[in-house]
């Protein structure tokens, strides 16, 4: 009964309303943290999962061994791989496509890869005017990997103790 009376007076005096207004007032005069995005950029974590890339070994050979683990583990079914056997008995990919309109950027493909062939870079600014522009082929993924290899290697090194 006493609790009901206390609740009645609190609601009658609009205590919750004033607590909310006090909180709003506190943030109204606090320092603003808005970032003007195209001109200013916030730091990106080494674990950020952005645009995909295929990597090469230092001798120039592509890392992907066509094990298809990334294709199997992808929950969105965004990866398509085709492969052929080479003369020395190893397999290499003939087709490696990622449909970024399906991809959910979960990072499972990167975790499943035994040779670190597929990685997600820190690139977050990419777009397409048509739906097909977000369909990345093997050559496009290798070009991204070649262009950003120093950043990819630095991010891998920064994250090495957590892997």
Swiss-Prot record:
Cofactor note: Binds 2 [4Fe-4S] clusters per subunit.
UniProt keyword NAD, yes or no: yes
Location in or out of the cell: Cell inner membrane
GO molecular function per UniProt: 4 iron, 4 sulfur cluster binding; iron ion binding; NADH:ubiquinone reductase (non-electrogenic) activity; quinone binding
Cofactors, names only: [4Fe-4S] cluster
Chain ranges of the 4Fe-4S ferredoxin-type domain: 54-84, 94-123
Enzyme Commission (EC) number: 7.1.1.-
Membrane-spanning intervals of the chain: none
Reaction it catalyzes: a quinone + NADH + 5 H(+)(in) = a quinol + NAD(+) + 4 H(+)(out)
One GO cellular component term: plasma membrane
Its membrane topology: Peripheral membrane protein
Residues noted as binding [4Fe-4S] cluster 2 in the record, renumbered to the chain: 74, 103, 106, 109
Keyword annotations: 4Fe-4S, Cell inner membrane, Cell membrane, Iron, Iron-sulfur, Membrane, Metal-binding, NAD, Quinone, Repeat, Translocase, Ubiquinone
GO biological process entries: aerobic respiration
Family: Belongs to the complex I 23 kDa subunit family.
Function: NDH-1 shuttles electrons from NADH, via FMN and iron-sulfur (Fe-S) centers, to quinones in the respiratory chain. The immediate electron acceptor for the enzyme in this species is believed to be ubiquinone. Couples the redox reaction to proton translocation (for every two electrons transferred, four hydrogen ions are translocated across the cytoplasmic membrane), and thus conserves the redox energy in a proton gradient.
Protein name in UniProt: NADH-quinone oxidoreductase subunit I
Name of the gene: nuoI
